[in-house]
């Protein structure tokens, strides 16, 4: 089920919310779990068995881990941990990477391996990382293993976060798995955040996506320098509003049910360094890699050479997590190298650069970094980057670039304003306390919702970009 289908915000979510608070407390988690499994199975019911088996495997493995650790059998516990992690990773590796790997082996070794093109289960990358988080937190004593199977299954499959995160850590959500009471202010706050996220996705990302895909269809060879930069800028803003919009919808929906999730974005395009950008962008994924990969490898505590290796490995894995294509590998290594340069080579020089210039430089580096991310092949990425820095047949600026600049500048201005914290501050001042302000705020959110409905009915938006990961 897609979160931008009319069925989700106007039927599925309201019915689930109503049932959750109408049912007795002892039935609420079971009802929410049933709704989450239905959400997962919608459209691809054949994959439900994979999720159920993963939940059962990790539930019993977690109980066994805790029991072995209490008995002091650390070696046996480590064996259970490793075997369960391998079992968790198998579906992810098969559905996301087998096709690319088989095709590569066929090319290199002239083999005839079958290249399957099976669609991946909904949110397989996200719920796999959720399961690994639970195992690690139990093994390292960060949280006790949840003894109630329904509550544990709900942690894994809770539908607001299932499709594209945020990746909620087990230690953060486990204390919240008790049924929640209805709190009007909390539900209202969640609804407002949900509408804001829906508007980001349907309105802003949709309006930015139309010219971007038009420029991408033209191809880098047909673009001018201005057109290539405009396309990269449109994608940078579109991806931000697409993914942060989904995150707001997920966090808002979870809040309606009483769950408090941490923010997943913190105005990343205001960052004054690449490291700061990644502390603000997809924060739940960054926290996951830092907590479960980077720090266990030694982090930055083991000398310069080891730290460089750790950074490169983590960013290689981050790229591969997004996909097996070479473009994602290059994208991950690009950020690994930038972070190494910032940390070990350019730190003192950058400290002397004014903050505003550091922000501009960081933003330009990030925009450049999105080119391999949205490109279908390395050749396309290289051609697009070449066009950004050297004029081809279309020159510095051409009719296509001027047309899309002329038709998109209003939405670009709105998008830039909304991507900066000033937009939030303006909203907070505008909707300050008071009856009149409350009425204006209500009308504002109703208007946003109506615009979203219009966009959803007309289909003037693209599917969630991060749903493919």
Q: Residues of each region from the PLM?
A:
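Membrane-embedded transmembrane alpha-helical bundles that form the catalytic cores
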Residues: 1-468
């Amino acid at each position: 089920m897609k979160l931008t289908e009319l069925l989700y915000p106007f039927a599925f979510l309201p019915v689930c919310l109503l049932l959750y608070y109408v049912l007795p407390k002892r039935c609420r988690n079971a009802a929410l779990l049933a709704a989450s499994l239905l959400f997962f199975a919608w459209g691809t019911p054949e994959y439900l068995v994979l999720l159920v088996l993963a939940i059962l495997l990790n539930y019993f493995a977690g109980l066994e881990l805790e029991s072995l650790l209490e008995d002091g059998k650390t070696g046996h516990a480590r064996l259970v941990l490793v075997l369960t992690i391998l079992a968790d990773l198998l579906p992810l590796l098969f559905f996301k990477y087998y096709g690319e790997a088989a095709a590569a082996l066929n090319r290199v070794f002239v083999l005839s391996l079958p290249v399957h093109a099976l669609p991946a289960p909904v949110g397989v990358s996200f719920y796999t990382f959720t399961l690994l988080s639970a195992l690690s937190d139990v093994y390292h004593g960060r949280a006790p293993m949840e003894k109630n199977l329904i509550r544990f299954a709900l942690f894994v499959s809770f539908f607001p976060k299932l499709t594209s995160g945020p990746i909620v850590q087990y230690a953060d959500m486990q204390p919240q798995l008790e049924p929640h009471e209805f709190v009007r202010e909390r539900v209202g706050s969640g609804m407002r955040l949900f509408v804001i996220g829906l508007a980001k996705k349907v309105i802003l990302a949709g309006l930015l996506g139309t010219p971007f895909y038009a420029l991408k269809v033209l191809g880098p060879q047909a673009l001018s320098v201005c057109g290539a930069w405009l396309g990269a800028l449109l994608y940078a803003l579109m991806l931000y509003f697409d993914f942060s919009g989904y995150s707001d919808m997920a966090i808002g929906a979870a809040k309606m049910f009483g769950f408090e999730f941490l923010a997943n974005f913190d105005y990343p395009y205001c960052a004054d360094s690449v490291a700061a950008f990644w502390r603000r962008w997809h924060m739940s994924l960054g926290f996951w890699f830092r907590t479960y990969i980077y720090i266990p490898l030694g982090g930055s505590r083991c000398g310069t050479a080891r730290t460089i290796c750790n950074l490169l490995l983590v960013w290689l894995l981050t790229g591969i997590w997004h996909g097996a294509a070479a473009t994602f590998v290059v994208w991950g290594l690009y950020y690994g190298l930038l972070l190494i340069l910032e940390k070990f080579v350019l730190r003192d020089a950058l400290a002397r650069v004014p903050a505003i210039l550091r922000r501009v430089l960081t933003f330009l580096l990030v925009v450049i970094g999105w080119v391999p991310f949205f490109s279908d092949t390395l050749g396309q990425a290289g051609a697009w980057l070449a066009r950004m820095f050297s004029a081809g047949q279309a020159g510095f600026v051409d009719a296509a670039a001027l047309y899309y600049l002329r038709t998109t500048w209003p939405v670009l201005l709105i998008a830039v304003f909304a991507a900066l914290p000033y937009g939030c501050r303006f909203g907070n001042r505008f909707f300050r306390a008071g009856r009149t302000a409350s009425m204006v705020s209500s009308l504002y959110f109703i208007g946003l919702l109506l615009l979203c409905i219009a966009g959803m009915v007309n289909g003037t938006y693209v599917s969630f970009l991060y749903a493919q990961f």
